[in-house]
Amino acid sequence: VCGFDGEIEIVEHDGKLIWRCPKCGNMIFPRINPSVIVAVTHGDYLLLTKYANRPGAQRTALVAGFTEFAESFEQTVHREVMEEVGLKVKDLRYYRCQPWGISGNIMMGYWCRLDGDDDTIHLDNFELADGAWVSREELRENYTGNGIALTSEMIAEFAAGRDPYSLEKNK
């Protein structure tokens, strides 16, 4: 929204979409906030979390977070998983991305495996209210996603055995 007049419209400028104020002509070049969403697997289990101190905290989530300056997406995956649930991961696989329009976020979806046998979750209680390993079978029986968000899609793919590690195993 224009800081001068409080209005905005989306227009094309030199082949790019920008925000422009129809009153004063002020042009705003929105920035993109890259982030990751991470499906951490451990055999037939998927790590699910719930956000703390946020509206909708009852909803199921995957580990997620923003990429920091000079950090690769893969480094973000390792850092966010360690910060939020205290686990090391390996075998990262890029899945796909999902833009979140007005907020300027773009989420890069990744699959990864737990590195090692210690699956003890150490929650960052500031960001998360809960974290648990949920079996593929339990997800098949009980999970109903919204069908829109990348989180929902990745959980459904895991439940159906279409995550990259299950597909490798079944070749």
Predicted regions and their residues:
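Hydrophobic alpha-helical positions that pack around
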Residues: 63, 77, 81
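Cys/His-rich microdomains that often coordinate metals
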Residues: 4-9, 28
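Nudix hydrolase/Nudix homology domain
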Residues: 9-14, 55-60, 124-171
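Glycine-rich phosphate/ribose-binding loops and adjacent secondary-structure elements
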Residues: 69-73
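N-terminal strand-loop-strand
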Residues: 16-62, 66-67, 88-89, 93, ...
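Active-site-adjacent beta-strand/loop module that shapes the phosphate/pyrophosphate-binding cleft
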Residues: 98-122
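Accessory, usually C-terminal, subdomains that scaffold auxiliary metal cofactors
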Residues: 57, 83, 96-97, 117, ...
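Short, cysteine/histidine-rich loop/knuckle motifs that typically chelate Zn2+
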Residues: 1-4, 22-23
